[in-house]
């Protein structure tokens, strides 16, 4: 599933093409993704200029004068920029095309767990949309620090890894990045969130930012379907310290990496480096 780094890589790849350009038309070939595609989307966007492309958590927000169209990549979704002169014939899983003068922005999603939604300007600020309003803080924002993690986890018995994944404290720390961040911070993923000290949470906040920044620099992680807007795979997974390395020696101390299951998700950690 594309997480924050993959979505940010997509945003950075798309924004230079679409910002300041007008949508000539929208071809919607699939009316139902995770939720119904708004029936009037094509008409709403025709001849509209894209003013900006932002990201909130794992959602992409495309602003036009009348509102925002919101895209979520789901588990297998991608957005590709294709030159107008050489656009391949739409395949089975190519659900929506936004057609500009010199290129096409194509949404592909084999499993159809992604979403394309509309939020009108009359409905208010897009960040108040029901899917966005309850999200945690952005990991690169000044609001995210060890004090926030410490304060929001007091009294919580859930594991620190599951607290990171929940998304109500901080957004975008998916399964890969939670395991990697906890390794960098030296925290065992099974530790109760409410028992982690403030100094350790300060290290974890820095580790989360560093891990996500490294992943963005490497084009994200490609485990199955993800490619960036240019069709290239990410390669962060090749440099992971612990993720998907069960039984292999720790890159720091040589201890075999362990794999456990937490909340039906695989967790990887070093029993020596992480306490």
Swiss-Prot record:
Keyword Mitochondrion: yes or no?
no
Is Acetylation one of the keywords UniProt gives this record? no
Cofactor descriptive note: Binds 1 zinc ion per subunit.
Question: Where are the annotated FPG-type zinc-finger regions?
Answer: 241-275
| EC number(s) stated in the UniProt entry for this protein | 3.2.2.23, 4.2.99.18
* Source organism, top-level taxon: Bacteria
Cofactor(s) required, per the database record: Zn(2+)
Subunit-level organization: Monomer.
**Biological function:** Involved in base excision repair of DNA damaged by oxidation or by mutagenic agents. Acts as a DNA glycosylase that recognizes and removes damaged bases. Has a preference for oxidized purines, such as 7,8-dihydro-8-oxoguanine (8-oxoG). Has AP (apurinic/apyrimidinic) lyase activity and introduces nicks in the DNA strand. Cleaves the DNA backbone by beta-delta elimination to generate a single-strand break at the site of the removed base with both 3'- and 5'-phosphates.
Q: What is this protein called?
A: Formamidopyrimidine-DNA glycosylase
């Amino acid at each position: 599933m594309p997480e924050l780094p993959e979505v940010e890589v997509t945003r950075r790849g798309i924004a230079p093409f679409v910002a300041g350009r007008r949508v000539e038309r929208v071809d919607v070939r699939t009316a139902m993704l995770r939720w119904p595609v708004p029936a009037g989307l094509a008409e709403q966007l025709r001849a509209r200029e894209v003013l900006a492309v932002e990201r909130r958590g794992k959602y992409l927000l495309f602003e036009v004068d009348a509102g925002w169209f919101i895209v979520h990549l789901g588990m297998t979704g991608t957005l590709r920029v294709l030159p107008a002169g050489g656009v391949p014939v739409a395949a089975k899983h190519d659900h929506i095309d936004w057609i500009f003068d010199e290129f096409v922005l194509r949404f592909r999603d084999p499993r159809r767990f992604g979403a394309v939604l509309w939020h009108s300007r009359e409905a208010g600020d897009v960040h108040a949309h029901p899917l966005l309003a309850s999200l945690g803080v952005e990991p690169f924002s000044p609001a995210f620090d060890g004090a926030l993690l410490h304060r929001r986890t007091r009294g919580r018995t859930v594991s620190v890894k599951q607290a990171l994944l929940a998304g109500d404290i901080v957004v975008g720390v998916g399964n890969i990045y939670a395991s990697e961040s906890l390794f960098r911070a030296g925290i065992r993923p099974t530790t109760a969130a409410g028992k982690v000290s403030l100094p350790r949470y300060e290290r974890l906040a820095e580790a989360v930012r560093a891990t996500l920044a490294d992943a963005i620099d490497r084009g994200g992680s490609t485990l199955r379907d993800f490619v960036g807007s240019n069709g290239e795979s990410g390669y962060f997974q090749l440099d992971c310290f612990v993720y998907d390395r069960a039984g292999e020696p720790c890159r720091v101390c040589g201890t075999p990496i362990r794999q456990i299951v937490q909340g039906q998700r695989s967790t990887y950690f070093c029993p020596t480096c992480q306490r």
